[in-house]
A protein has these predicted regions:
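Beta-strand-rich interaction surfaces with strong enrichment in secreted/lumenal proteins
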Residues: 1, 40, 67-68
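Short, aromatic- and glycine-rich surface loops/edge beta-strands on solvent-exposed regions
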Residues: 24-28, 72-87
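Solvent-exposed serine/threonine-rich low-complexity stretches and specific carbohydrate-binding patches
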Residues: 35-53
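Signal that preferentially marks extracellular ectodomain short beta-strand elements
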Residues: 52-72
Length: 117
């Protein structure tokens, strides 16, 4: 997995497989509150970040796309990384991580908080 840095100095998850229009998702689940966030990128490989969807699961009882950024609180999360490897398969790996200010999973140096673009 690669972490890219945008022009606004925010770091975001990024990985693309070889298929022309892959589906990529990062899911974070807080181990204590069970609050869940997902970040989806359905852009073509050649044009990343042109088709993004941000969802805070359960925000209004259903999955709701967000136009603003999502702040992810410092805490203990299960981080699921999904990558579409073929037209029919969506693989995932699970990593367990404590998220602290300053780590480079998703980081905004403006407010020292977890932020999805």
């Amino acid at each position: 997995m690669t972490i890219l840095q945008s022009a606004t100095n925010d770091l975001i998850f990024y990985k693309k497989s070889g298929i022309s229009s892959p589906y990529y998702l990062v899911r974070l689940v807080n181990r204590i509150t069970a609050k869940e966030f997902v970040f989806l990128d359905q852009s073509p490989v050649a044009c990343p970040f042109i088709s993004l969807q941000l969802i805070e699961v359960g925000r209004t009882g259903t999955e709701s796309p967000l136009s603003a950024s999502i702040k992810v609180d410092t805490g203990s999360y299960d981080i699921y990384l999904y990558d579409q490897v073929s037209s029919t398969n969506l693989d995932y790996t699970l990593t367990n991580s404590l998220l602290y200010e300053g780590e480079a999973y998703v980081y905004s140096d403006e407010d020292l908080d977890r932020t999805f673009l």
